[in-house]
Structure formats: C-alpha cells, structure tokens
A protein has these predicted regions:
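C-terminal structural segments of small proteins and small subunits
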Residues: 67-89
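A short linear hydrophobic-aromatic micro-motif
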Residues: 34-36, 80, 90-94
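Short S/T/G/P-rich N-terminal loop/turn motif that feeds into the first structured element of a domain
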Residues: 1-72, 96-100
Length: 100
C-alpha cells in the first residue's frame, strides 16, 4: 500500500512554480515519492472550497509517515519558501488516502 494526496492549487506564477517543481522533485524522489497525475484546469464545475483551483495533481508516497517526513524535511522547506509561496495563491487538500 502507498499513500496518496490529491491537491488543488491556484498557481499565479507558472515560471516560479515550475522552478519549485524542478527543485523539489529530486528531494521528493529521495523519499520514494512521485507525482501520479498532474493537470492544468481551465474550469472548476464544483468545489467544496472557496479557493480558486487551476492545477490538480496527485502526489504519492510509500506511507503516510514518509509523506510527513518529506513535508517537514529542511531541504524541502527551503525550496518551498524560495519558490512556492510566491507562485501559489491558495492550496486545497482534496483528499489523502491509502492507495493500491
């Protein structure tokens, strides 16, 4: 079993967000994580959140514990602080669950 997060973002700076992805992916892979799906969304038909969403993706980890370790990793937090906060207006957690 693996652990999957489904996320929705409102990306406001595509170039800066791409830099974030390029820098964080090696860290993500070092934890055994990866992106399963990644979509740019042009229209949201229904949402439980008031946040705008223009990007939807899944991010997969070997376990919830590994996911938690990744998101608290100092190297990841430095990349997030440098690129993510200036490129994303809002974050919507759509779902977290065990996956086959």
């Amino acid at each position: 079993m693996s652990f999957e997060r489904i996320m929705g973002l409102d990306v406001i700076n595509d170039e800066e967000y791409q830099r974030y992805r390029e820098c964080m992916i090696p860290i993500l892979k070092s934890f055994g994580g990866n992106f399963g799906f990644d979509f740019k969304v042009s229209e949201v038909l229904k949402s439980k959140s008031d946040n705008a969403i223009n990007r939807v993706f899944t991010i997969d980890f070997p376990s919830k514990e590994v996911m938690d370790a990744f998101f608290s990793d100092q190297s990841y937090l430095e990349v997030k602080n440098q690129y993510f906060k200036n490129s994303v207006k809002s974050v919507t957690l759509i779902s977290m669950h065990e996956a086959n």
